[in-house]
């Protein structure tokens, strides 16, 4: 795949990678960036990360919370989730304030399958604090970031979150929790989804291709 895409370099000014699963997407993007002299961008990772970071920063401004102090739980540990977390950390969120859950539950340092985890997951493994499932991890958190599956955030879980919680339920087509359901149990929630039929859409379609700008060209 890397060889095929690299062979297209003379024809295009930039390449967007789409729908490559983790961990293969990390390898493909890295190798192409090493070989190509044009921008190579994996939209599922970085497009999602850019729009999610914008949503988080705007939400924090509204509720007057500091990115360095808030806590976050992430449901999902694929390419998009890891890219979002990496960008949020780069913007000032403390890694120790982040808890990540995959399909097996909370990712912690002594979990029995740690040796088989992708490096990207291991980076976000927390010290064992007894939390094992999403329902444990979400308690008291300021932010829920969902890049996993439909209806995984139950109303009773949302009720345990901190004051003025932010929920980004980005699974498509069905989010981790529906906005009306979230508002019913937590009127103080700020909620965004990946869908265009609800307010506060958080979707990489808002970023796609606007991040690529030509600085110079050899065409005349």
Regions found by a protein language model. Give the residues of each.
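Glycine/serine-rich phosphate-binding loop and adjoining beta1-alpha1 elements at the start
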Residues: 1-68
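Short glycine/serine/threonine-rich phosphate/pyrophosphate-binding segments
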Residues: 25, 48-53, 79-86, 151-156, ...
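Active-site nucleophile and cofactor-binding loops and adjacent substrate-binding regions
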Residues: 41-50, 73-77, 196-198
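Glycine-rich phosphate/diphosphate-binding loop of Rossmann-like nucleotide-binding domains
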Residues: 51-138
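Rossmann-like NAD(P)-binding element
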Residues: 112-158, 162-170, 176
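Rossmann-fold NAD(P)-binding glycine/threonine-rich loop
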Residues: 171-202
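Conserved small/polar residues in nucleotide/adenosyl-binding loops
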Residues: 210-219
């Amino acid at each position: 795949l890397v060889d095929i895409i690299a062979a297209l370099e003379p024809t295009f000014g930039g390449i967007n990678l789409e729908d490559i699963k983790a961990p293969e997407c990390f390898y493909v993007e890295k190798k192409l960036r090493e070989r190509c002299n044009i921008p190579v961008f994996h939209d599922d990772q970085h497009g999602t990360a850019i729009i999610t970071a914008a949503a988080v920063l705007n939400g924090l401004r509204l509720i007057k919370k500091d990115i360095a102090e808030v806590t976050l739980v992430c449901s999902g540990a694929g390419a998009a989730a890891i890219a979002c977390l990496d960008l949020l950390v780069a913007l000032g969120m403390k890694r120790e304030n982040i808890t990540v859950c995959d399909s097996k539950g909370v990712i912690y340092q002594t979990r029995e399958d740690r040796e088989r985890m992708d490096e990207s997951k291991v980076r976000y493994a927390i010290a064992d604090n007894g939390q094992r499932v999403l329902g444990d991890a979400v308690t008291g958190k300021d932010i829920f970031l969902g890049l996993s599956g439909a209806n995984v955030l139950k109303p009773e879980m949302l009720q345990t979150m901190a004051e003025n919680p932010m929920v980004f339920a980005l699974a498509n087509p069905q989010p981790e929790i529906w906005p009306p359901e979230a508002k019913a149990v937590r009127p103080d929630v700020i909620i965004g989804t990946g869908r265009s039929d609800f307010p506060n859409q958080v979707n990489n379609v808002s970023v796609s291709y606007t991040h690529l700008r030509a600085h110079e060209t050899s065409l005349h």
